[in-house]
């Protein structure tokens, strides 16, 4: 379907660095609390050092995933450079004393070996590498651990290009147990907080570089590309808020893009709680197959009393159905309770 409509399809090759079989055994034994503790906090507790033989076995499994993706018609594979791959690269987390630990060459050995083997086994597929960068958080503190500091990331980026990686995706490192590091809520990080890092990486390589991290408007995305900080913009939560973000921009309707407010309530919080993914600004998210705004049988004149959240949404849907809508609001501003909610700091 993607190819029939002129789109390319990519998947992410991801190893969560959990021992999935061990977790599955705990579930089958009815040890739910123990399994849940490991699932939520395994990155800080219950850590075992994977053997070199097990690492090679993991690469074989990832190779098999790439083969299956190729057979399914997938065009691009993104190697997720965080989690297991990132923890091996990390000077903070990796305390190994074998060929996979110590200096930068050893710590990145697994990642580079994986990339080389993928290029060999699926040579006609685009290989993107998600490059997680550890960023400073105050004095002698860091945000994210499962990645590389900028100086090492710059060296590693050039090595990835030399190994045949086609594109690099610059992102905030995670692996701290705090999803807010990589998916920051409103006010916790500046807009475009990874752009300065992608710019440095882009200056060192000749392959395309993408960046992600609180780039929420078409204008901000365009500015990043125009000033040479990246070639591609990565969107995450914004596509839950408005799946037509890119289409609206391509059609010249940037002003109609529904902007993500980074509240994390329907998306990140629900991921953490293993709940249904949703969006507080997009009631259709997750229900695209069943919730359709269809034209009304006849057009009517509709008066909406109050320009609060409910009134504005009712007006929007009514207008899309073909009705002639007039909104009446007694105050000088629309928004209702949102105006009060926006007053506290960081809102």
Write out the residue ranges for each language-model feature.
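Flavin-dependent oxidoreductase catalytic cores
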Residues: 1-305, 309-325, 333
């Amino acid at each position: 379907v993607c190819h029939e409509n002129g789109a390319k399809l990519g998947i992410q090759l991801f190893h969560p660095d959990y021992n999935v079989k061990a977790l599955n055994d705990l579930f089958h034994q009815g040890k739910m609390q123990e399994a849940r503790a490991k699932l939520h906090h395994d990155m800080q507790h219950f850590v075992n050092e994977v053997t070199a033989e097990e690492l090679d076995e993991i690469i074989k499994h990832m190779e098999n995933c790439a083969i299956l993706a190729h057979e399914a018609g997938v065009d691009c594979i993104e190697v997720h450079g965080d989690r297991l791959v990132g923890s091996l690269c990390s000077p903070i987390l990796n305390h190994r004393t074998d060929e996979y630990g110590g200096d930068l060459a050893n710590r990145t050995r697994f990642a580079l070996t994986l990339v080389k083997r993928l290029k060999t086994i699926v040579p006609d597929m685009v290989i993107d590498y998600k490059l997680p960068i550890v960023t400073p958080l105050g004095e002698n503190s860091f945000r994210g651990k499962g990645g590389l500091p900028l100086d090492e990331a710059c060296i590693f980026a050039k090595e990835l290009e030399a190994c045949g990686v086609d594109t690099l995706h610059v992102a905030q490192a995670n692996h701290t147990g705090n999803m807010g590091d990589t998916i920051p809520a409103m006010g916790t990080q500046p807009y475009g907080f990874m752009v300065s890092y992608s710019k440095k990486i882009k200056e060192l390589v000749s392959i395309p570089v993408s960046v992600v991290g609180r780039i929420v408007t078409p204008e901000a995305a365009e500015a990043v590309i125009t000033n040479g900080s990246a070639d591609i913009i990565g969107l995450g939560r914004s596509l839950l808020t408005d799946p037509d973000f890119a289409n609206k921009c391509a059609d010249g309707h940037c002003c109609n893009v529904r902007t993500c407010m980074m509240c994390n309530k329907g998306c990140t919080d629900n991921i953490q709680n293993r709940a249904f993914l949703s969006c507080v600004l997009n009631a259709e998210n997750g229900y695209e197959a069943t919730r359709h705004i269809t034209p009304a049988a006849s057009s009517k004149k509709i008066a909406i009393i109050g320009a609060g959240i409910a009134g504005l949404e009712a007006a929007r849907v009514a207008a899309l159905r073909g009705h002639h809508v007039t909104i009446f609001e007694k105050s000088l501003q629309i928004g209702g309770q949102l105006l009060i909610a926006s007053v506290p700091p960081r809102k």
